[in-house]
A protein has these predicted regions:
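Active-site capping/gating regions of soluble enzymes
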Residues: 1-189
Length: 189
C-alpha cells in the first residue's frame, strides 16, 4: 500500500470532511495519477526481475502495462472538474457549484466497494496499492521510486499554481485550473 501522510499523521489520500479537505485530497490524488503517467518506466524498472517480468501480464493480474484504477464515482468527479473549470475567471456561483461537488467525495467513496484487482496502481478508498512488485520481492526500490517521483510531481504542480497566482489568478482558481490540466494530461494512465 502507498500512503502519503503529513508529519502529524494526516493521510493525504483520505477524503476530507469538508470542501477544503477534499481539495487537498484531490490535489494529491491527481498528482499521483500524473506521477504514474510520467514515470511508468521508472516504476516498472523498480519492480523488475526475471520472475516478475514473466509473471506480469501472463496468467496472473496485474498486467505489465501500468494503469491506475480510481473507481467510476471518483473518475466521474475528475470528469466534472474538467467539464466545469474553464480558462476564464470563475464566477462565485461556479466556484460554489464546484466546491459543493467536491464536498460530496466522502459520501461517494463510502459507497465504492469495487477493488479492481487487475490494475497495478489502484486507489482503494484512502490509499493507492502498487500491486506490481513480486510477492517475495523487497519493495524498497519501488517505494523509493514512487516517493521521489511523487515529490518531483508535487514540486512541478506547486510551481504551476504559483505561476498562475503571480499572473493574478486566485489561489483556489489556480489550483482548479492546474488540477484540470493535470487530469487531462494524465488521462491515458
Amino acid at each position: 500500500s502507498d500512503l502519503l501522510c503529513t508529519d502529524t499523521g494526516i493521510n493525504l489520500f483520505a477524503p476530507g470532511k469538508n470542501p477544503k479537505g477534499n481539495m487537498l485530497f484531490l490535489t494529491f490524488l491527481v498528482n499521483a495519477l500524473m506521477m504514474v503517467y510520467k514515470n511508468q518506466d521508472l516504476l516498472r524498472a523498480s519492480i523488475m526481475s526475471a520472475s516478475n517480468s514473466y509473471r506480469l501480464g501472463a496468467n496472473e493480474a496485474p498486467p505489465a502495462i501500468l494503469s491506475c484504477f480510481l473507481g467510476s464515482q471518483l473518475s466521474s468527479t475528475l470528469d466534472e472538474i474538467v467539464r466545469q473549470v474553464g480558462n476564464e475567471k470563475m464566477t462565485p456561483e461556479e466556484k460554489t457549484t464546484l466546491k459543493l461537488g467536491i464536498g460530496r467525495i466522502p459520501e461517494i467513496l463510502l459507497d465504492t466497494t469495487d477493488r479492481n484487482r487487475t490494475s497495478p496502481f489502484a486507489f482503494t478508498g484512502n490509499r493507492f496499492e502498487f500491486r506490481a512488485a513480486g510477492s517475495s520481492s523487497n519493495c524498497a526500490a519501488s517505494m523509493i521510486a514512487i516517493n521521489a517521483a511523487m515529490a518531483n510531481q508535487l514540486n512541478e504542480f506547486r510551481a504551476s499554481v504559483e505561476k498562475l497566482m503571480e499572473e493574478g489568478v486566485g489561489k483556489d482558481e489556480a489550483i482548479f485550473r492546474i488540477l484540470k490540466e493535470t487530469i487531462i494530461a494524465s488521462e491515458p494512465i
